[in-house]
Regions:
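Membrane-interface transmembrane helices that cradle and orient dolichyl/undecaprenyl
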Residues: 140, 183-207, 218, 373-376
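Short helix- or helix-capping micro-motifs
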Residues: 23-24, 151-156, 185, 215, ...
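Short acidic/glycine- and proline-prone juxtamembrane loop motifs at membrane-interface regions
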Residues: 166-175, 354-355
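Hydrophobic, aromatic-rich transmembrane alpha-helices
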Residues: 237, 305-329, 340-343
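Membrane-lumen/periplasm interface segments of specific transmembrane helices
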Residues: 238, 248-292, 395-407
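Transmembrane-helix motifs of polytopic, lipid-linked glycan transferases
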Residues: 114, 118-142, 182-186, 316-322
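Transmembrane-helix signature of polytopic, membrane-embedded enzymes
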Residues: 18, 110-111, 135-158, 178, ...
Length: 410
């Protein structure tokens, strides 16, 4: 049997990518440490997630379906309807937050809060690392090693993604972002396999399961991510137009897998699942937001917070994409299209869901920018492009590290 850790599978590129991801994790851990160093009790949102998740793990009902006052945790009027059901999320985030606490051998008291309060953040830190690894894998396949490292460098020193992974004064939107990224690129990968003359379901069952898992993670973390279901179908049919019937079969199978996993998040309680689905806010868009100038400013701020380097790199790559036909191929166009769509959906959802769409757009934007830069690096201007890209990455990294150093304790 061929060994797994061969030079081809795990060489210098993988080692360097691992170091970048460790740097990302270290920055997120620093944020968690800065917050938990003095704060002995979780804030109201985190306390609600932990309390509701703990309730479900201990068989006292389903998390946020509905939120029960008897637990001692107040209802959040911004995230629950009048019946106490969370209209934005399934129990996934609650269950994931509380799951690591099942391993804590002592009481969850204030004396030991310095230690156990790290545990609810572990799943979200892991999601941040997994999203970074997924981004590097996709960017490397699309743009080569150089493009992959550019995208991963953007990601690993992105203030907004570091903050989201650490859940530092924000919602755990990193889970929905990871699910969205996995859904889109798994659908594209599955579509490419349809050109091989093999049985549709038998050969693709692993990718079907992976697509279903990605859908369950995304929709379970944010109900409005249901838009990924038709988006996945669109990519399946577009990439493999000669085998659209096979693509439709795979899409249906993946949706069934995703629905089963989402039902499992409710611990297979049919009544709570049905009531939660009935009250879920799958579509809360309002087009009035597009008439408000402040919404556009907020999107611009989000892009700047995502990566300071985008202030220079994004305009350059957009102009290049518009004026140079060579860059307008599927590998660049698809992530740009998804990023733009997510930005529009973020603007149309001014409440909790909007932040999830805006964050989910950022990894796709990194793929697009790195892809266009990789194309520019193949021209006669490679030395100039390489120098400018290096300067931009150094500036972005330095500004992020400086901002982290100035984070107040507590």
């Amino acid at each position: 049997m061929r060994p797994y850790f061969t030079r081809e599978r795990f060489g210098q590129p993988q080692s360097f990518a691992g170091l970048l991801l460790l740097a990302f994790l270290a920055q997120a851990l620093w944020l968690v440490h800065a917050e938990l160093r003095t704060a002995r009790e979780p804030d109201s949102a985190e306390a609600m997630r932990i309390g509701e998740g703990w309730k479900q793990w201990n068989g006292r009902g389903v998390a946020a379906a509905p939120v029960l006052d008897a637990t001692g945790i107040p209802q959040d009027p911004f995230r629950t309807d009048e019946s106490g059901f969370d209209a934005e999320h399934s129990p996934l985030l609650y269950v994931v937050s509380a799951a690591p606490l099942l391993l804590w051998p002592k009481d969850l008291g204030g004396e030991s809060a310095t230690y156990w309060r790290w545990l609810p953040r572990v799943p979200f830190l892991a999601c941040g690392v997994f999203l970074g690894a997924s981004l590097w894998y996709v960017a490397r396949r699309l743009c080569g090693n150089t493009g992959g490292f550019i995208a991963l460098s953007f990601y690993c020193f992105s203030p907004s993604l570091i903050q989201a992974s650490a859940v530092w004064h924000t919602e755990p939107e990193i889970v929905a972002a990871w699910g969205a990224f996995g859904t889109i690129f798994t659908a594209i990968a599955v579509a490419h396999t349809l050109y091989a003359p093999r049985e549709v379901v038998l050969w693709n069952w692993r990718r079907i399961v992976l697509l279903g898992v990605s859908l369950a993670i995304a929709v379970g973390s944010q109900f409005s991510m249901i838009v990924l279901v038709p988006m996945a179908l669109g990519f399946l049919l577009y990439v493999a137009p000669v085998r659209r019937q096979a693509g439709l079969v795979i899409w249906i199978a993946a949706c069934v897998v995703g629905l089963a996993l989402l039902f499992g998040v409710y611990f297979f309680h049919p009544h709570e699942f049905a009531e939660s689905m009935r009250r879920a806010g799958f579509w809360g868009a309002t087009w009035r937001a597009f008439t408000v100038l402040g919404v556009y400013k907020q999107v611009a701020v989000q892009i700047g917070r995502a990566c300071p380097a985008l202030a220079v790199a994004l305009p350059v790559t957009l102009v290049t994409y518009a004026t140079w036909p060579r860059t307008r191929y599927f590998g660049n166009s698809a992530p740009l299209l998804v990023a733009v769509l997510f930005f529009l959906l973020g603007m149309a959802h001014p409440h909790v869901a909007g932040g999830g769409f805006l964050l989910a757009a950022i990894p796709f934007l990194f793929i697009f920018v790195s892809g266009v830069l990789a194309d520019l690096l193949e021209t006669q201007y490679r030395p100039l492009v390489m120098a400018c890209t290096g300067v931009v990455l150094v500036f972005s990294t330095a500004s992020t590290l400086l901002a982290l150093a100035q984070v107040p304790q507590g």
